[in-house]
Amino acid sequence: MKFSELWLREWVNPAISSDDLAHQITMAGLEVDGVDAVAGEFNGVVVGHVVECGQHPNADKLRVTKIDVGGDRLLDIVCGAPNCRQGLKVAVATVGAVLPGDFKIKAAKLRGESSEGMLCSFSELAISDDHDGIIELPADAPIGVDVREYLHLDDKTIEISVTPNRADCLGIIGVARDVAVVNQLPLTEPDMAEVVASINDTLPIRVDAPQACPRYLGRVVKGINVKAATPLWMREKLRRCGIRSIDPVVDVTNFVLLELGQPMHAFDLDRISGGVIVRLATEGEELTLLDGTKVKLNADTLVIADHQKPLAMAGIFGGEHSGVNEETRNVLLESAFFNPLSITGRARRHGLHTDASHRYERGVDPALQHKAIERATRLLIDICGGEAGPVVDVTTASELPKQATITLRREKLDRLIGHHIPSEQVSDILRRLGCKVTECGSDWQAVAPSWRFDMAIEEDLVEEVARIYGYNNIPDVPVRADLVMTKHREASLSLKRVKTALVDRGYQEAITYSFVDPKVQALLHPQQEALILPNPISVDMSAMRLSLLTGLLSAVVYNQNRQQSRLRLFESGLRFVPDNTADLGIRQDVMLAGVIAGHRYDEHWDLARQPIDFYDLKGDLEAILELTGKLSDVQFRAEAHSALHPGQSAAIYLAGEHIGFIGVVHPELERKLDLNGRTVVFEVQWNKLADRAVPQAREISRFPANRRDIAVVVAENVPAEDILAECKKVGANQVVGVNLFDVYRGKGVAEGYKSLAISLVLQDTARTLEEEEIAATVAKCVEALKQRFQASLRD
């Protein structure tokens, strides 16, 4: 926001320099981006009166004038401006004046006529870019007075960055409040007294959407002269704020917008049919805006309409049909409070961003509308004439924002600031900020002012007290930290350790968005409902992820499209699952996921080009599970998963509890996602693995180990893992190692069966095992396999 320093000083005028004022505003939390002079450096320019203006005898486009500048005689000045005429008050650069750019004015002859000065335009004084003609000063401008003094050009424009929470500072009044509070000065408001109605004319107003528009004020003003000139003082204030003067009606509404931060709009009363209705648009309803753009409205867009058609997008942009023009004689002034949620996003949807929408989206003071409409009425009548009717007020009090009541505890204040501020000073700061304060012992209860939407919790009051007290007034105290050795649980396995292990195995960590494409996610999880964002960044980022794989697989496609054929990626992060039993109906699980694609090894002269398979990723995952000390409790069970290949996937169980899955991406899904070649994925719940099993010390046997090999024939559907587990269970005291070293199908083995060759390593910690004991243990294993799996020894 840009504003004039002198305009600000009309409200509050601290006895400090411009630079100090800018620094003070920054320290109050409103960062100053720039301070610039409103005009160039010049001198010797005074107010003059055009006494005579005639045609130059030797030039069609020049005029010869006689100018009264309050001296002993009239000055002869040649001027080429098309708007130069007799009776005009102008800015005259006399002989000896120095204009911006070190341009010195000297007496000269132009086409044979003497010229003793120059009549100046705004651009020649570096006030603005307007060079269409000379400056036209008000008729009551005193002759001979320095133009710099008369136009208050020893002024500066201050531009500040207003954070979204400080919408109250999108008007001079908000900045002035902060400056007044910091300097402990009163606020001098301009006259905003009620304008007594001189006519009884009103227009019926109906609000059909009170939640979106809790307050709507309308006032009829009749008999105005739109062709009246906007006063120079108002045009200058608007210009210094970066607003171009258009006509007096628009200028008045813009002036009130900049002064109070309240957007206003003026409708041509004679173009409104029946009355005003504030309602939601019907889907596809069309409106032609003031700039001639045609828009199709959505059903959630608030409009100001009459009994036949929409007139304006509420709080955003006026309509062309009801706009004020040169023929307008009667207007309806609008001053309203629109709920920020009813305005947010609607302007962007149509490629718009207006001063009004900028303020309404952030929030306007709901107590400001009466003050604004009275101020605008008075200014409009003073400039354009006319008669005002009574204000029609349609307010739904229950829908207006409620002022927050906040308790501030002394203990919290001192702890967060780290400095003790006297209680009387705290109370004074809160009251000067506009809060209604009740002192409760050492604490305070404060009711936030209507213009401060950002005051909602105790920390907000702490921030305000510290801000006004001055961060620079809080003494620097070295932080005292007692070094206490933290306890480290041996059972804790950090996620960082696991990430390091994956990096060591050739993986790269990926970080993807928690917002994913709902269409892609539906392919991976067709049976699960996801959380859909009401205001997404984009359509393809509108769902919260149910799995890390949605983002990881998109990353694989992205990299493959950029000539990366061999990929090893992993990611850790939250998934968001709708769950009525969880807090806020959302369960958040920390997940660890990985994906591999391409060849097993980088291209090498001594290595064959082998594509990755299921067991490559399973081996990497088992290495991670080994770190947890729980690998022996983990089972990989063949279970169907809609996103995975039915014959090359498995569910992962830990001590009987499902914790994840692993497998090759389903060929159909691979095609739909545009994956290039076989892709293998895994995902596990990290919370189930974060506590590792601490290894227990045990004695290493000094006695020889004995190996015995057996080959058993079992049905094809019997998992080898179950066979090995049964052998470990039966020979628990003596079998120290079990390994599957061969799988055979073919001659000698019936169809539907397979032969598993298993090595059993037997050892005792106290003695050397006898052959009879070894044979007995092996026989027990074979018998157990026969009983449970109908296994038989292979001949």
UniProtKB/Swiss-Prot annotation:
GO biological process, one term: phenylalanyl-tRNA aminoacylation
Necessary cofactors: Mg(2+)
Domain tRNA-binding as annotated: residue spans: 39-148
SUPFAM superfamilies recorded: Anticodon-binding domain of PheRS, Class II aaRS and biotin synthetases, Nucleic acid-binding proteins, PheT/TilS domain, Putative DNA-binding domain
Example of a GO MF term: tRNA binding
PROSITE patterns: B5, FDX_ACB, TRBD
Pfam families: B3_4, B5, FDX-ACB, tRNA_bind, tRNA_synthFbeta
Binding site for Mg(2+): 454, 460, 463-464
B5 domain residues: 401-476
Signal peptide feature range: none
SMART domains documented for this protein: B3_4, B5, FDX-ACB
Catalytic activity reported: tRNA(Phe) + L-phenylalanine + ATP = L-phenylalanyl-tRNA(Phe) + AMP + diphosphate + H(+)
EC number: 6.1.1.20
GO cellular component: phenylalanine-tRNA ligase complex
Similarity annotation: Belongs to the phenylalanyl-tRNA synthetase beta subunit family. Type 1 subfamily.
Subunit structure: Tetramer of two alpha and two beta subunits.
The protein, known as: Phenylalanine--tRNA ligase beta subunit
Biological source species: Yersinia pseudotuberculosis serotype I (strain IP32953)
Lineage: Bacteria, Pseudomonadati, Pseudomonadota, Gammaproteobacteria, Enterobacterales
Gene this chain is encoded by: pheT
